[in-house]
């Protein structure tokens, strides 16, 4: 999804909100296209239906890391999971698994982000589990 939404409850946007957004260059000229995208995704809970698999696989990734005693950096209910890896485990995993560094917390701790999607396969999660088992 390409876009962000600002929600005001009770239809009460702050005074001059849209003027300030425009003035600071934060309003896209083609905003209608993004609006159509948001409208479509939130009609009949389509967004939640298509993201269900990604969130379920991310939850399983979290469980796999917890099973192997790896610290979860942030509580994330989304398709992204953040874990704390040692430099040694980071190096070993980065040879076999796609993920990215989110933050170098210290010389001994690296927070890494693992992201799932509609295309994430259970076999890939099983492989992650096997890889971590080998380093336990």
PLM feature segments, named:
Residues 1, 5-11, 112-118, 136:
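Electropositive, surface-exposed helix/loop patches at the edges of structured domains
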Residues 1-78, 85:
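Active-site C-terminal subdomain of aminotransferase-like
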Residues 16-28, 122-136:
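A short, terminal or domain-edge coil/loop segment
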Residues 59, 64-134:
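Conserved C-terminal alpha-helix-loop-beta "cap" of PLP-dependent enzymes
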């Amino acid at each position: 999804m390409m876009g962000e939404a600002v929600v005001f409850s009770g239809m009460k946007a702050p005074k001059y909100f849209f003027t300030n957004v425009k003035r600071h260059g934060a309003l896209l000229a083609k905003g209608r296209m993004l609006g159509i995208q948001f409208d479509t995704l939130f009609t009949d809970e389509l967004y939640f239906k298509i993201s269900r698999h990604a969130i379920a696989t991310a939850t399983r990734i979290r469980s796999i890391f917890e099973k192997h005693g790896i610290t979860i950096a942030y509580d994330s209910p989304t398709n992204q999971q953040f874990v704390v890896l040692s430099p040694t485990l980071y190096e070993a995993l980065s040879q076999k698994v796609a993920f990215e560094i989110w933050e170098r917390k210290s010389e001994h701790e690296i927070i890494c982000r693992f992201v799932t999607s509609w295309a994430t396969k259970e076999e890939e999660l099983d492989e992650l589990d096997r890889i971590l088992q080998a380093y336990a």
